[in-house]
């Protein structure tokens, strides 16, 4: 199960500098900071506001830029065109995004969404990212490329702080040393080590085959434990 896997796994700089908001008091919810060249109501007397031109938003330390945006309320915004969400080393690229500041979640949409973190790049179609926990997820198929490694799965959970990807459901992972197929894998993006769970088939470059329900691949020593 996902819970078991999780337990086992144990150009934006200017926008960021412009929007330094004071820290909220204890128990106070931090609002979304916004800036743009132009803004105005979508319709006369409407509280919904359209923003365009050098737009940027900031919340929980994440900076979001795009071509234009619509603010529906103080905590709910929709972004259009060349959307970029950046927090620390994570960069998320898409065509459109919806952000709900009450739950700290950005839902990103595009024909192909790209999530870049150092050498690792994740490609998917829909991506949910929490700007407070720094955890993202996809459930419609995703592919991660990291140096010589390729990892595919139907669902996945990206942990920006620990540099891990939990891949779930029809997982395939391969590089020059081995190919792995299984139900779930925890992949360390820094070390390239992988922890696998349940119904895992592994073939190495020499043609050797291994089946396991639980184990680990150590990149440094090329060991299957």
What are these regions (language model features)?
Residues 13-225:
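N-terminal amphipathic/hydrophobic interface segments
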Residues 1-11:
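Bacterial N-terminal signal peptides
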